A protein has these predicted regions:
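Bacterial N-terminal signal peptides
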Residues: 7-13
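Positively charged n-region of N-terminal signal peptides that target proteins for export
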Residues: 1-4
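Beta-propeller folds
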Residues: 16-283
């Protein structure tokens, strides 16, 4: 007796659908603002209140991401990916109920980093409104802000700027002008990736997001290299040294010297950039 098997063809329809919105009671709980961040000025009189969203947006979560030398970056913004940003900032004085909002920032601006001047009269801000992050400076007394440097900041690694002790200028890490386009994956490797297993057997820590190829090295150079700029609060600027991968910038207390920690090749494939070797050139301020 023959058995006849009938195969039923069930059509599968895939439709593009939009995100569904939960009931308002649930949405209000999820979207409730987080506790604001407070930052006290060096003079212990003024303070800054910064607000941020409770959850990252779909745009932020879907942004491109590169994993290089133990650091995850957003290549479109030349900054760490999914880092905390603030959507609103207001100035207050201790003992006063009145607040001063920061004025002059772009619409829908996000503040990625900020720093009080040593005298407490100004605040430097790393602000984005699109794919680039720029340096703004705010007057603490009036709340008025203005863009100080048109070149985009480099926020991939380390602090993007630091104040000099006189509160009249900052040292800034900027993306290189005319740096061209990012390296393509099809580039020919310069040689094989090799590791040596010498010495005694010992346990070794492992890390994620490390460099793995010459292509990763090329991307690391492209996105992490900065030009150091000395810029006054009035907008006068001058370049300091040659471009490099800057780990740290330390101005001397008297303002005459600046110690700059720079990372050089060969880059490590077994530890993140925070563990790599560096050189310590010192430049004299003129």
């Amino acid at each position: 007796m023959k058995k006849i098997t009938l195969a039923l063809s069930i059509p599968i329809i895939i439709l593009a659908s939009e995100y569904k919105i939960p009931p308002k009671a649930i949405a209000d709980i999820v979207d409730a603002p987080l506790t604001p961040t407070m930052s006290l000025s060096p003079n212990k009189i003024d303070y800054l209140i910064l607000s941020r969203s409770s959850l990252p947006s779909i745009e932020e979560l879907s942004a491109p991401e590169l994993r290089l030398a133990g650091v995850r970056i957003n290549p479109a913004m030349n900054a760490r990916s999914r880092r905390t940003s603030y959507t609103e900032a207001k100035l207050h004085q201790i003992g006063q109920s009145r607040s001063i909002p920061l004025k002059g920032l772009p619409n829908n601006a996000k503040i990625h980093s900020f720093s009080w001047s040593p005298d407490g009269k100004s605040i430097a801000l790393a602000v984005s409104s699109n794919a680039e992050i720029h340096l703004y400076i705010a007057n603490v007394k009036t709340g008025k802000s203005k863009m100080l440097l048109r070149s985009p900041l480099n926020l991939t690694y380390g602090a993007p700027f630091v104040w000099r002790s006189d509160s009249q200028s900052l040292i800034v890490k900027s993306v290189l002008e005319r740096r061209g386009i990012a390296p393509k994956r099809g580039m020919k490797p310069s040689g094989p990736t090799t590791q040596e297993n010498l010495g005694k057997i010992a346990p070794a820590r492992t890390y994620q997001d490390l460099l793995q190829s010459s292509y990763d090295e090329a991307l690391f150079d492209f996105y992490f290299t900065s030009q150091i700029i000395d810029i006054s609060i009035k907008g006068k600027k001058k370049l300091i040294g040659k471009p490099g991968i800057v780990k740290r910038i330390d101005p001397s207390p008297d303002g005459n010297y600046t110690m700059i920690q720079i990372i050089h090749k060969p880059y490590s494939y077994i530890v993140p950039v925070s563990y790599t070797h560096l050189t310590l050139p010192t430049s004299r301020s003129v």
